[in-house]
């Protein structure tokens, strides 16, 4: 059995963590960073880039670079690249594959299982899509866990057995959640959760982009939003400015050669955004976090004064205005500073993986369903069977009847949401229960059962009590993918993994060949006086053969050329060694001759006799 990891699959960045010796450790990726950008790019040579490498080339490859795909999970969104369509789970699977690969590289063994986190306010469709992404990436998804719950698990286990109430304020790149949890004696229980799946750091970035574009248009009369490459540069500059404003009062944004004017003269963007101006243009976004905050307190029936700790989660909570608002909403409570908002969710996910694998004992996680579940009844009414903030897993049944005489079947339409009319809520799926015995309306008894598992994924069944006929649906409209499609995507992902590995190996061969030719030529140049002209020509000929092979696509030809160059290099090295050895022998011979002369008994070393002095001595 392979290892299990915890994964925070984020809108902007993702993190993977593993349990080692009972402690959760965040794993650095192949680039050495503890966070991996959730960006996937399809290079024009067919290579699939994920993470920082995808982010680095985004400006030059805008149409083939995909970011913030998490916002499309649970929808029918697709992107077409090279006449092939990719769904949101497929793109997310690429990020998961990289995290899996980096974890395996660190651990030195296979990673087979994972706990993956999702925003607490994700509906069934989005949860199912996330689970599908894990499956496509070759992972057995042990559990889908709410991000605030994972954060509280990571934070709360260090706080001992004393029962405490924790507020988790989670503002990520694309989603917002706020949850109230009670932790004590190894039990983590979610009391209530609320949020907004369309609110996150991306929206703050977009406000800066709009501000910059408006400023530039006013100054130069050019709309940068119409230029894809310029727009991508604005997005990257906006993200950097937002981060800078978390620690500085102002941020300078300078983008040279952003575009050209009508006469093809280059134009430059140079603006300064102050923190005050930034907060002014994003105030309405900040205000949107207040409603879910108040809703959670109301649903949990808890006052602000009863909150013991406040935990900020998600990189977007580093914005000064966000932390100030949380302090204001909690009557002056300072958010906990000892938690890394980028990593705490992945750490909690790794702990939950440990719980599910039996590696962490005496911990019980009690999560809730974020939205009410029900069916459409006569008049389009939403009849709820499971209310929001119900602890999961759970199962509820209710008996319904027919609306017409001799009705042969009933259509069960499953919805998720809080609105009174079904049409205003999210349709999760529908199925038909046929074969109902003819009877006056109101007589047949049809039992509808909702079953939510620990992942928050819903199954619904309907049973005619008279005939015993039953029909069940596991809601899978979330990703719009059948099991056959998922299996195909798994194979496709495996194939691409092999292709990517092959491409990497081929590039390594090319890099090695190029380096070999360069180093060999440099060595010849540095040792010209020691190498015969004939040997130099042979080596240069072999190096040219490598150059020619590198122009083509035949990897075996490159390897053969390198092998021949290597052989010629060894011959050259041998010749140099022999020449130096011979030269050394000659020098040794000369030394030996001198030594023999010194052995003459009539010769005295270093004694000089002055003739005049000798004459004086003789006189004495």
Curated annotation (Swiss-Prot):
Upregulating conditions: By stress conditions e.g. heat shock.
Alphabetical list of Gene3D superfamilies matching this protein: 1.20.1270.10, 3.30.420.40, Actin, Chain A, domain 4, Substrate Binding Domain Of DNAk, Chain A, domain 1
Superkingdom of origin organism: Bacteria
Biased composition (Low complexity): 583-597
Key words, A-Z: ATP-binding, Chaperone, Nucleotide-binding, Phosphoprotein, Stress response
Positions of the UniProt region annotated as Disordered: 492-519, 583-620
InterPro entries: ATPase_NBD, Chaperone_DnaK, Heat_shock_70_CS, HSP70_C_sf, HSP70_peptide-bd_sf, Hsp_70_fam
NCBIfam families per record: PRK00290.1, prok_dnaK
Descriptive protein name: Chaperone protein DnaK
């Amino acid at each position: 059995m392979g290892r299990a990891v915890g994964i925070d699959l984020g809108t902007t960045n993702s993190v993977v963590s593993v349990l080692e010796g009972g402690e959760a450790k965040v794993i650095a990726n192949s680039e050495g960073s503890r966070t991996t950008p959730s960006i996937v790019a399809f290079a024009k040579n067919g290579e699939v880039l994920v993470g920082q490498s995808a982010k680095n080339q985004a400006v030059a490859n805008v149409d083939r670079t995909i970011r913030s795909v998490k916002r499309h999970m649970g929808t029918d969104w697709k992107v077409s690249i090279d006449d092939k369509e990719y769904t949101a789970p497929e793109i997310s699977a690429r990020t998961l594959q990289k995290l899996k690969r980096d974890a395996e590289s660190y651990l030195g063994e296979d990673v087979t299982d994972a706990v993956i986190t999702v925003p607490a306010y994700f509906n069934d469709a989005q949860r199912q899509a996330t689970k599908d992404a894990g499956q496509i990436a070759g992972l057995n998804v042990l559990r889908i866990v709410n991000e605030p719950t994972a954060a509280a698990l990571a934070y709360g286990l260090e706080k001992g057995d004393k029962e405490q109430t924790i507020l988790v304020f989670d503002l990520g790149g694309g989603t917002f959640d706020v949850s109230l949890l009670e932790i004590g004696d190894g039990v983590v229980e979610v009391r209530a959760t609320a949020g907004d799946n369309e609110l996150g750091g991306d929206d703050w970035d977009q406000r800066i982009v709009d501000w910059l574009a408006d400023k530039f248009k006013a100054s130069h009369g050019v709309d940068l939003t119409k230029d894809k490459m310029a727009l991508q540069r604005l997005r990257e500059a906006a993200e950097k400015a937002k981060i800078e404003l978390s620690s500085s009062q102002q941020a300078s944004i300078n983008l040279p050669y952003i575009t050209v004017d009508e006469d093809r003269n280059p134009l430059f963007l140079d603006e300064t955004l102050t923190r005050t101006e930034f907060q002014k243009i994003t105030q309405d976004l900040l205000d949107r976090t207040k409603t879910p905050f108040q809703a959670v307190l109301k649903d949990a029936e808890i006052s602000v004064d009863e909150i013991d700790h406040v935990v900020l989660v998600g990189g977007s909570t580093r914005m000064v205005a966000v932390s100030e608002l949380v302090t204001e909403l909690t009557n002056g409570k300072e958010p906990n500073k000892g938690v890394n908002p980028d990593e705490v969710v992945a750490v909690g996910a790794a702990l939950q993986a440990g719980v599910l694998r039996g590696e962490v004992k005496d911990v019980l996680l009690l999560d809730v369903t974020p939205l009410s579940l029900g069916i459409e009844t006569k008049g389009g009414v939403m009849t709820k069977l499971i209310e929001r903030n119900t602890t999961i897993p759970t199962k509820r049944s209710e008996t319904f009847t027919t609306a017409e005489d001799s009705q042969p079947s009933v259509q069960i339409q499953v919805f998720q949401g809080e609105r009174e009319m079904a049409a205003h809520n999210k349709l999760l799926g529908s199925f038909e229960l046929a074969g109902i015995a003819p009877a006056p309306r109101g007589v047949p008894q049809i039992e509808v059962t909702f079953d939510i598992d620990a992942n928050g994924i819903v199954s619904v069944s309907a049973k005619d009590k008279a005939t015993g006929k039953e029909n069940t649906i596991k809601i899978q409209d979330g990703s719009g993918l059948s099991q056959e499609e998922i299996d195909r995507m798994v194979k496709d992902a495996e194939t691409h993994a092999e292709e990517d590995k092959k491409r990497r190996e081929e590039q390594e061969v090319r890099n090695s060949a190029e380096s070999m030719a360069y180093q060999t030529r440099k060595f010849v140049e540095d040792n010209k006086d020691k190498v015969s002209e004939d040997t130099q020509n042979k080596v240069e000929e072999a190096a040219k053969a490598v150059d020619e092979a590198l122009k083509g696509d035949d990897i075996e030809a490159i390897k053969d050329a390198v092998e021949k160059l290597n052989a010629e290099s060894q011959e050259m090295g041998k010749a140099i060694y022999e020449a130096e050895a011979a030269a050394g022998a000659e020098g040794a011979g000369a030394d030996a001759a001198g030594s023999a002369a010194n052995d003459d008994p009539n010769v005295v070393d270093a004694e000089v006799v002055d003739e005049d002095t000798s004459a004086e001595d003789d006189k004495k």
